Amino acid sequence: MIENYWTSFCGNHHTSSNCTVRFLQICFGITLSFLTLCICLFHKEPPKRIHQFFCLRLVSALFNGIIGSLDLVLGIWVLRENHSKPLILWLVILIQGFTWLFINLIICVRGTRIRKSSLRLLSIFSFFYGLVSSCLSVNNAVFGDELAVRTILDVLLLPGSVLLLLSAYKGYRFDESGESSLYEPLNAGDSNGFSEKADFDNRVSQFAKAGLFSTLSFWWLNSLIKRGNVKDLEEEDIPELRKEERAETCYSLFEENLIEQKRRLGSSCQPSILKVTVLCVWRELLTSGFFAFMKIVAVSAGPLLLNAFILVAEGNASFRYEGLVLAVLLFFSKMIESLSQRQWYFRCRIVGLRVRSLLTAAINKKQLRLNNSSRLIHSGSEIMNYATVDAYRIGEFPYWFHQLWTTSFQLLIALGILFHSVGVATFSALAVIILTVLCNAPIAKLQNKFQSELMTSQDERLKACNESLVNMKVLKLYAWESHFKKVIEKLRNIELKSLKAVQMRKAYNAVLFWSSPVFVSAATFATCYFLDIPLRASNVFTFVATLRLVQDPVRMIPDVIGVTIQAKVAFSRIATFLEAPELQGGERRRKQRSEGNQNAIIIKSASFSWEEKGSTKPNLRNVSLEVKFGEKVAVCGEVGSGKSTLLAAILGETPCVSGTIDFYGTIAYVSQTAWIQTGTIRDNILFGGVMDEHRYRETIQKSSLDKDLELLPDGDQTEIGERGVNLSGGQKQRIQLARALYQDADIYLLDDPFSAVDAHTASSLFQEYVMDALAGKAVLLVTHQVDFLPAFDSVLLMSDGEITEADTYQELLARSRDFQDLVNAHRETAGSERVVAVENPTKPVKEINRVISSQSKVLKPSRLIKQEEREKGDTGLRPYIQYMNQNKGYIFFFIASLAQVTFAVGQILQNSWMAANVDNPQVSTLKLILVYLLIGLCSVLCLMVRSVCVVIMCMKSSASLFSQLLNSLFRAPMSFYDSTPLGRILSRVSSDLSIVDLDVPFGLIFVVASSVNTGCSLGVLAIVTWQVLFVSVPMVYLAFRLQKYYFQTAKELMRINGTTRSYVANHLAESVAGAITIRAFDEEERFFKKSLTLIDTNASPFFHSFAANEWLIQRLETVSAIVLASTAFCMILLPTGTFSSGFIGMALSYGLSLNMGLVYSVQNQCYLANWIISVERLNQYTHLTPEAPEVIEETRPPVNWPVTGRVEISDLQIRYRRESPLVLKGISCTFEGGHKIGIVGRTGSGKTTLISALFRLVEPVGGKIVVDGVDISKIGVHDLRSRFGIIPQDPTLFNGTVRFNLDPLCQHSDAEIWEVLGKCQLKEVVQEKENGLDSLVVEDGSNWSMGQRQLFCLGRAVLRRSRVLVLDEATASIDNATDLILQKTIRREFADCTVITVAHRIPTVMDCTMVLSISDGRIVEYDEPMKLMKDENSLFGKLVKEYWSHYNSADSR
């Protein structure tokens, strides 16, 4: 039945070449119609034109309209008479008639609405279409039996096409003012190609205004690629994206569709994020789908032409010049295939770019809206992973999307061609293909499972990496690097197990699908043998050619499955995140401030809870509060009483479960933990506001920043590091205060802002900032510093989530027992050494300001944050060698490459055996098939060896590279973290490492495979027809030159892409960390817009990179088409019988796949060149200059060192970088063993630097520190830090349990931990938790108050019981009552230890043995506190006088 159908479709089998020609005519007609449609739809914004030569267009319209109409009538007539004519004949005539009418309508009637360049290009294509159709019709009329009427109509197409050409060029007069000429990119610019006009036309990509020819040929990229060959590209050299690809456009469309879907579904249903995303890109998906369809149709013409060519070689030509015609058709079919495939891939990449941009933008916006419960589920590191890994994986999926259906479609067409070649034996081929797919089905399910496991384990490892990198200073201080590194290594090993499973399945799939053509061929030929179907060169090599063209898409099935699974898992994770609950206004209402209204905040019977409604007892209960404008309200209470939660409730962070809360006007917020952005000090203060010089200067003065800025290299333009790592805690807090003050808000919420600054600065800030600058504002200030309380209009006393007392200071002091205990506790901590107040309290301030130099810790060159390293020029072989040298991976790569070469040689031997013996009567068919199968099986064995070796190399290299990277990062000095943004490091351990794990290993072998296959194809062509070398050698040379020309630009584009990707990650990391502050200042929109800008900055080099890739491939495909056509011409010109038809068929079958092989070769090389940059980027961080060794065996201190804790500091000099000034300038002093040492000085005077030197976080450039006779510079840093104890200024908790945070090394029993918790006033709090010591501590310890976090840090020190303990203002964030208990605990637990206290509170050091005063990096004085207080010129004495002057004045109010 199928045989009869084929006969009715094509007619006589002996005229199959005519059938092929007709089939190609149908393809060309459809292509031209689609091209016309595209011009009509997408190129219809014309410049102004004046009509001219109307008669010419009228004549053309009438003449061509008549021809087209007659073609349609003839086609319908032939259709009715199909019992006597082949089906394909009426189809050709109908399509030709429709195409001609459509083109005529556009050129002659609608031409005034089409771009000039597009109109002229269409007329040129129409002319060639008419010319070819006329020639073919005349040829068929002479040598065949074509219809006479159709011949006449086809001949008339030629004059008709000339009329269309004239109509396009002469039928209109165009106004050139607004038109971009088709050839404008060729002529624009000066001799260097870089005139101002050609300089990307207002920074927008040339793609935005490219004509049809320029779009199809990627001509618009010429200027950028040329520029990349003249100079190394920089970010500013890359044009901006056109509007359609910008993140703002993509996200706006996403939001519109989301709103529309919500409106349709109603409030009860959540719209599908996937559906909304597809709605944003469906047009481009359809367009790319059409190009995919055209590519499949064009590629399917190859085997048909090959079959016709072999028939001609056997002497069965239908007419004299049939071979030449077939060669020309072969060339044009390959060119159409190239154009279609390039546009298919290019437009899919655009879809991927848009999806990636809109998802990244959506993640950025969503994270600014997450409520507390959502943040507990989606940690900061996970959010980073969604944007930096998952969004990129989804962005890659559209590239593979059409492979899901084109593979099946191409397979169906191939089966049709195979049936024409070998008849019913095709069913054997189909059975093997189905069996192959069925074998892959369970593997696909396993792959899905393993991929999910891999992504989950990757998340866990990234979370641990992020936590360790963020808190690296704490890890070094506690000497916990090795333990946390082992935790990460353990998670990495779990990840590697999943990676191995994924890669082994990928290897299995590769073997399965690469070997399937061998088994398909063997099964088919065996069926032919048993069914006595003759095997001839024409049907065998038509079969082989068809199979060679099908096998590449079939081989891609594993990749398609893998990418689809990855995208599915990634999309589900992002969708879950985007659907997470957001902050709700609830009962919180913001109202405009009116002139008559004096109320700033009104809270009525409100309760607030961090958890879900009704799930637990509310964190704040029965809160009623009114704050008026101009009123200053202090909030105090013990640790964990709910002070910070109250501020969070007013900000809307803590959900209101009952009651109401109203506020009037704008809010400014200062968090307890300072949040600083990477950038200049001015940027941090302005925070997006407009510069007002007067207000700005006043803000600097009121925030006590003026003296600090005077000493900075560039003043307020000095760049500060990520999270303000190069600033002291006090400086960061004052920048926060300046940011809030500059906003000139109506309501100020200040969360313990003075805990991080010294006593003098705190006093100055309170007077100048709170009482003066904020006069007239509503101020709610959380504080533990009781001495400030008398100045407030009212004081709120909180306990256990309730406001227990609210009144003036004097009233509370008179009647509240709890408040009296609070004040008395403060007086007790202050000690009894009361100093008489000075007569003029302001005088000491001036004197102290004169004495204390504000030398800052940041006195360095203004650019602390280093610009990200970016290699320039050719990467060379270095990164490849670095990758393959890991664990001797080169051995496995060599074996894999050898196996791949053997496989390719085996395929050639297979086909050579078949070509040489298919027509040889002396070789039986059975022998022919058996030898063919045996060679194939040997080749498959080589494939298995190749795949296994690649997986082994992958695992060894991935494990080794990450191990080196992790060791390097954990051994890097703190100066590296101070000058390197976290996002830059995280991009290495996330996206770059993911590429190295998943893409690089198979990328290497695919480059070898595709290069070997291309070489084999060229070799076969050259052996069969050596004359083609005259064409192929220059063409291959041209291909290499084009590739080199391309690589110069492409590598820089990918490097810039990697660098700009870090910008997106950095901004997201900062936004996640500062989300509360951003929301408090209503700056969400500004941060979101900045994220859009950064996404575009990253997307632009990526867009131009993949466009450049298509630019190169299209030119290489043209080269391969020329080589193929030249080979065909050579074969035609050779005398008949020079080569057997078998070898001719073999050569052409390889030639047909040459362009595909060349494309895959270059494409794989390009991908690998881009991927190998990730190895290069990892390598930048695997060879960081390490800090001192952890352990030096020759100089290890005794086990019980230090015994007494005597610290001798001799002429200590510290600078942070070689070119920076000294921060400590010759410090010399001795801390006797068992003494309690207090270190005081103004913020930035060098106190923290001295502590850093003691722990060797920074190495001295001169002098030394000796502890109990041991020079600490001579021993390992682990031995040093593990013997000291510290309670850092910024309390840090890690994700895990209470037990883990107190004892991560598991060195103590539960009983010891409970005992310590009791001493630190945490026992009751932990016991109230359901899980006790196993109670959850989330990332950053955000589910515990700041004071509780600091108590945990104290607990660590008590557990360690070191002979030398350092307290860096350890009690700054706790209330005075708790402070009193803790001071007693420290005195009791560390009675015989050396305790070094960096103090901001003067009372903290009053009971110290000695006090060290530092100013400007030098020792001002060092003596007993009582002696210093008696000295009139003593700096410490003046600080104490200032403190008590302020305290006494407050106490008397």
From Swiss-Prot:
This is ABC transporter C family member 10. Residues 603-825, 1207-1441 form the ABC transporter domain. Gene3D superfamilies: ABC transporter type 1, transmembrane domain, P-loop containing nucleotide triphosphate hydrolases. Disulfide bonds: none annotated. Ubiquitous. SUPFAM superfamilies: ABC transporter transmembrane region, P-loop containing nucleoside triphosphate hydrolases. GO terms for molecular function: ABC-type xenobiotic transporter activity; ATP binding; ATP hydrolysis activity; ATPase-coupled transmembrane transporter activity. One of its GO terms (cellular component) is membrane. It holds the Pfam family ABCC10_N. InterPro entries: AAA+_ATPase (IPR003593), ABC1_TM_dom (IPR011527), ABC1_TM_sf (IPR036640), ABC_transporter-like_ATP-bd (IPR003439), ABC_transporter-like_CS (IPR017871), ABC_transporter_C-like (IPR050173), ABCC10-like_N (IPR056228), ABCC_6TM_D1 (IPR044746). The chain crosses the membrane at residues 23-43, 58-78, 87-107, 124-144, 147-167, 290-310, 312-332, 415-435, 511-531, 889-909, 925-945, 993-1013, 1020-1040, 1128-1148. SMART domains: AAA.
